[in-house]
Swiss-Prot record:
Cross-referenced PROSITE patterns: ABC_TRANSPORTER_1, ABC_TRANSPORTER_2, TAUB
Localization in the cell: Cell inner membrane
Pfam families (alphabetical): ABC_tran
Subunit description: The complex is composed of two ATP-binding proteins (TauB), two transmembrane proteins (TauC) and a solute-binding protein (TauA).
Gene: tauB
UniProt domain ABC transporter: residue ranges: 2-229
Organism encoding this protein: Shigella dysenteriae serotype 1 (strain Sd197)
Residues involved in ATP binding: 34-41
Purpose: Part of the ABC transporter complex TauABC involved in taurine import. Responsible for energy coupling to the transport system.
GO cellular component, one term: plasma membrane
Name this polypeptide is given: Taurine import ATP-binding protein TauB
Presence of keyword Nucleotide-binding: yes
Enzyme Commission number: 7.6.2.7
Amino acid sequence: MLQISHLYADYGGKPALEDINLTLESGELLVVLGPSGCGKTTLLNLIAGFVPYQHGSIQLAGKRIEGPGAERGVVFQNEGLLPWRNVQDNVAFGLQLAGIEKMQRLEIAYQMLKKVGLEGAEKRYIWQLSGGQRQRVGIARALAANPQLLLLDEPFGALDAFTRDQMQTLLLKLWQETGKQVLLITHDIEEAVFMATELVLLSSGLGRVLERLPLNFARRFVAGESSRSIKSDPQFIAMREYVLSRVFEQREAFS
């Protein structure tokens, strides 16, 4: 379980997050949504251990987070892949740093690539892949170390609408298959409503938790309902419009 208690943090010397309290249980998919500059990415970087926080605590499985760790896998918007390595070696890179023997790490990488639908692309280089394929490699790399928690920072923001839909459904299938805790940062309202088991809205400016919304659309998808059916459901449309109105309220209040 991820437990965030009374978290305060700065960014660029200015307060960015104020009194954040969140819990992410095993098997849940928490989505954090808010206007630009509300501290979404700062929150993810704190959980990943990339930057220090000023007050409060972040704990995973009862242990305080004070730096990066293999129990947290991170997927970035820009992928962060190594262009001089092929796809399989990119996925295996973290395992290499951990001292895993070569044949074992390549086998793990191969299995992860199968999970994300890239079987047969192991020897390609990053420049030979589409944007969606590169994000699949990033997800496979994050999963290779078998982390307790998967963190994703707007991973589909640069993709076209069709590819974004494919990646959303892939991530939901992986979430169901692995049972991992997942925390997704996004600015896309429809994506947030579709994918979250709990949606956290952050306020503009100094990031505070504005509202927490339990949702069931992701569970409906993994239970077998199509994404098209879900997104055309009046309940989904009403929730999307409600969240949109809340985000616009924050933008207007901060402008």
